[in-house]
Amino acid sequence: MEFTEQMLERVAMAVNGTTELTIDGKPISFKAPFRRLTMTDAIREKTGYDITGRSEEELREACKQLNVEVDETFGKGKLIDAIFGQYCEEELIQPTFITDYPREMSPLCKRHRSNPDLTERFELFVNGKELCNAYSELNDPIDQLERFQEQLRLSEKGDDEAMFIDMDFVRALEYGMPTCSGMGIGIDRLTMFMTDQSSIQDVLFFPQMRPEKKVVNDPAEAYTAIGVPEEWVPVIQKMGYLTVESLRKLAPGKFFNDLCGFNK
């Protein structure tokens, strides 16, 4: 976080000659240090509700009391995110680090070294928008597989944003991955902030919108036509093989290993 705030302070000085900027008519200071606030404290500050140790049912009831719109597919992570998104995100005008995300919100993040219910993750918000996302990478294959299995349960509930079980990734972790971390910064959004532009189109070199890439799923009939029993089709697609062509390209031994690992 210190690196991030110092970098952005230097960027503001290099571009504008000052750390005191005006963005969308609001005065915003990029002078380090930035405010630090845990996810739990941010929600408590704006709603009075403490998410610590709450079950999915308790969080769902809290959303109802707070008039946060959710549906039955939401797990704990999305319920917390919905509360944060409605009550907190747009209020974070001055640069603010939100830290210590609950584990359910971050399926690829390492558990917090002092609280296993949280993760070592932070996001930086400026002018009510996310600018950076950073975390320590989860490198424990057992923990990662359990997280993927939880994502599978959410997918079975109807959450179309839940991850599938990536057995190649889990197997790679079993060979060993050193401790590491990373951060992603929205460079286009940062450019908007530094130049006080309200539209991303004004800061892109090539502003023409490209059509969105669509995910193609073959129907069950395409699988049964090559001899796959119909009851196995949902399982195979949850493993990430969404088309018959992707299945044809797969070595039988690898598919067998993936399937065995998936069933575990």
Residue map of PLM features:
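Compact, charge-rich alpha-helical regulatory domains located at protein termini
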Residues: 212-264
